[in-house]
């Protein structure tokens, strides 16, 4: 599959298209075929090096796609479900805490990829009338 990796923070010209294997979801993860993604301001700041991220990071925190595989412990999703990314994927409920405030695309790989294996709680159901 193809994915865009940021070779090194410092500008949008630092992206490179790479070929990697389709990831296998862990027991608490789902595999998503990414149908749409977008570059938002947070992603731009990571690409420019204004928000720290690792060399080789796969950016993009906004996406929509279809569940193509579910891990053995996944209970909330089925193959074929339409999902979209959540801004704070580690904040499930309750008051915000510092450890919840991580973004996909800066401290873990994001959606600039054809497929992503991600925790089942990192996405939400896409409204049926959205395309």
PLM segments and residue spans:
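Well-ordered beta-strand positions in beta-sheet-rich domains
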Residues: 17-19, 115
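Glycine-rich beta-strand-centered segment in the early N-terminal region that forms part
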Residues: 21-37, 47-92, 107-110, 122, ...
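Short structural boundary motif marking the start of a folded domain
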Residues: 1-4
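A short glycine-rich beta-alpha junction/loop motif
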Residues: 115-123
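Short, compositionally biased
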Residues: 95-109
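A short beta-to-alpha transition loop/helix N-cap that caps and shapes the active-site region
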Residues: 42, 90-95
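Short beta-strand/turn micro-motifs composed of small residues
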Residues: 7
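Short N-terminal binding/cap micro-motifs at the start of the first secondary-structure element
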Residues: 11-15, 41-43
């Amino acid at each position: 599959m193809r994915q865009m990796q940021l070779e090194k923070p410092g500008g949008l010209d630092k992206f490179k298209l790479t070929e990697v294997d389709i990831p296998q979801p862990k027991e608490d993860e789902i595999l998503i075929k990414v149908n749409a993604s977008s570059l938002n301001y947070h992603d731009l700041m990571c690409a420019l090096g204004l928000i720290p991220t690792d060399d080789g990071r796969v950016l993009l925190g906004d996406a929509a796609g279809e569940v193509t595989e579910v891990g053995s412990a996944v209970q909330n999703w089925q193959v074929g479900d339409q999902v979209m990314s959540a801004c704070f994927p580690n904040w499930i409920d309750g008051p915000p805490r510092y450890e919840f405030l991580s973004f996909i695309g800066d401290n873990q790989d994001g959606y600039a990829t054809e497929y992503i294996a991600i925790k089942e709680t990192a996405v939400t159901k896409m409204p049926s009338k959205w395309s």
